[in-house]
Amino acid sequence: MPALSIPQTVFLCAEGREGSRRGEERFHAAKERWEGQSGGAERGGNAGYFHKKGFRDIEKLKQDILAQEQRVRETRTCVQEAKEAYSTAINRRSASQREVNELLQRKHAWSPTDLERFTSLYRSDHANERAETDAQEALVVAEREAEEAAALLSKSILSRYHEEQIWSDKIRRMSTWGTWGLMGVNVLLFLIFQVAVEPWRRRRLVKGFEEKVMEALERENGMKEGVGAVEGATLRDGATTVPAAAAAPSLIAEPVTPTFSNISDETPAGPSDAAMFTEQDVPDPAVVSATAPTLTALQPNKQSQSSTSALLLPPDASLSPDSWRQTIHDLFGERRITLSQRELTTVALESAAAGAAVMGVLIALFRPR
């Protein structure tokens, strides 16, 4: 093998490394041109999204780390080749020196072939020494480049880790504020529902209930008035029937005693006639007793209707100070109310949720930064 083969191998390795580096640079330049020219709309939206979120720098660092890892692998391969070349140069020079020493030991018995061999070894010793020195220098350069590549790779990895930490903190902060915002919206909706929607719904239910009660009372009063009218008509029919029945015997008896008609006309009415007229004018006691409870029952119904409507009418729903004062007095008064277990549990859970939300908002606002 020629003496110049070892440094040529090392230099070819270095040239190959430089060529691969230039190839990577051309590849990245072409990739950037392609990304800038094609797919502008869709890729522009993704780039804007990643740029806003701070993830584009992380992607760039990731690509740099991949390229740096490839460079580290190449430098390690070159270091291995330089070590092999340096070992080969050392072995070749050592073998040449051993052969020279052997020839010098039998110098008195040299043949023409030994003389030519000694001459060639002596001439190549300088070249072998130069090749060994070049291989050593190439090994040092390769090791230094490998160390630089490894250090740059570590730096890139640390930079990527730092950027990812910053990005994750930013996303976590945004998610935290988003969570607090949603919680605040929920609390606001809860307060709006409790302050505005719930009273409106309650008033609507009370109004509907009052309308139904009033309709039922009016229907009942109408039925009672109809019954009273029927009973009054019955009483009037009974009152007209009694005089007709009393007058019928007199009409029948009148033709039998015609001679006494004048006498009866002239004779004043006696006690019997007064009793008869009294019986005709006075209605039946049973009918009077039947109508009296009906008439007395109508008056309590009217009174109960007025009292019920007075109780069911809602308080003034205006925004006047008197209305608010009355509402606060009702909230903190001694009035007894009846609640079901479900309503009590619902009120307790709503109060606990509202307290937790308020405490969370206060902690988020006043906690030390």
UniProtKB/Swiss-Prot annotation:
InterPro entries documented for this protein: MDM33_fungi
Membrane-spanning segments: 177-197, 346-366
Subcellular location: Mitochondrion inner membrane
Mitochondrial matrix topology ranges: 367-369
Keyword Coiled coil: yes
Any one cellular-component term (Gene Ontology): mitochondrial inner membrane
BP GO annotations: inner mitochondrial membrane organization
Coiled coil regions, renumbered to chain: 128-156
Membrane topology recorded in Swiss-Prot or TrEMBL: Multi-pass membrane protein
Mitochondrial intermembrane topological segments: 198-345
Pfam families: She9_MDM33
Record key words, sorted: Coiled coil, Membrane, Mitochondrion, Mitochondrion inner membrane, Transit peptide, Transmembrane, Transmembrane helix
Known partners and oligomeric status: Homooligomer.
Function: Required for the maintenance of the structure of the mitochondrial inner membrane. Involved in mitochondrial morphology. Causes growth arrest when highly overexpressed.
Similarity comment: family membership: Belongs to the SHE9 family.
Stated name of the protein: Sensitive to high expression protein 9 homolog, mitochondrial
UniProt source species: Ajellomyces capsulatus (strain NAm1 / WU24)
